[in-house]
Amino acid sequence: MAVEQFAESRSLWLKITAWEKAVVVHEVAKLAKPKLVLEIGAYVGYSAMNIARAVRPHGGRVVSLEVDPMHVTIVRNMVEYAGVSDHVDVWTGYCYDVIPHLLDIYGPHSIGMVFMDQKGTRFHTDLQLMEELGLLADGAVVLADNVLKPGAPLYIWHLMHGPYRNCTSVSVREFLLQSEDWMVMGFHDASLPPVAPPPTQLNRVAFESDAFRKRSMFDSVAPSKSDWWAFSQRFVDGLERSGCKPPVVGLHGRDNPVIKPEDIAGIFRSAGRLPPPPPQGTA
């Protein structure tokens, strides 16, 4: 995409889900075939355009939420310029105010995919709101970015101990950086019981995640690469001690993880959402 090329040509890091992250988002949307996708955190519209291209062939629609009015204006112009505005609606406001309107407009069990790219320590609360409103279709796929950096431990707990199956962490490179990040996904199963309360130590990990996120917003106190690496180790250790470290796919080398479309297809097969591949040598 032009947004990605612009950033690469200037070595300018942008908060966009590019490189392997773009592959994950596109493949999940393409394989899930949702009629309605909810994106939380539009930024400049990069992911909204990516998802729209994936769901357009089967008539899917994207509702993208953004709290910043300036970014909303940018996204609306970007999707128009990209030729996908007929498949994308951009709404302004906070999740707890805006999400209930989805029920009024689209009805219950209407959301087939959720992509979350807002504040990581809010992933689980926004997801719980959708559950309480009955917005998620059975089998809806939920995907979130930046789950390792700056981290969303309570979201992982929610997927592994709540009404979801096949929680999987996809290891990817951060755009224009060589650092590892996780995108974590799962499939909604309404027959499972509500999530149990997380252990206290996981709340402490979430507190530290939020502190690192706030530090990263200011150059004078931004974490160094070694700070991030040490925090990532503590993050993973905290998940393991809490019994909620999901299986990881896509990590084909710690310093240069590469995700491939077949990795995403494998997750969908494990969840029973795709048939098994034909035997080798079969036409």
Which residues does each predicted region cover?
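Glycine-rich phosphate-binding loop signature in dinucleotide/nucleotide-binding domains
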Residues: 32-33, 104-110, 136-137
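S-adenosyl-L-methionine
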Residues: 68-113, 121
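Conserved SAM-dependent methyltransferase scaffold
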Residues: 48-52
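Conserved SAM-binding motif I beta-strand of class I
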Residues: 59-66
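Short helix-capping segments at alpha-helix termini
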Residues: 57-58, 81-85, 134-136, 164
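Class I SAM-dependent transferase core
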Residues: 1-36
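Class I SAM-dependent methyltransferase "Motif I" SAM/SAH-binding loop
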Residues: 41-45
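C-terminal substrate-binding/active-site "lid" region of AdoMet-derived donor-dependent transferases
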Residues: 122-282
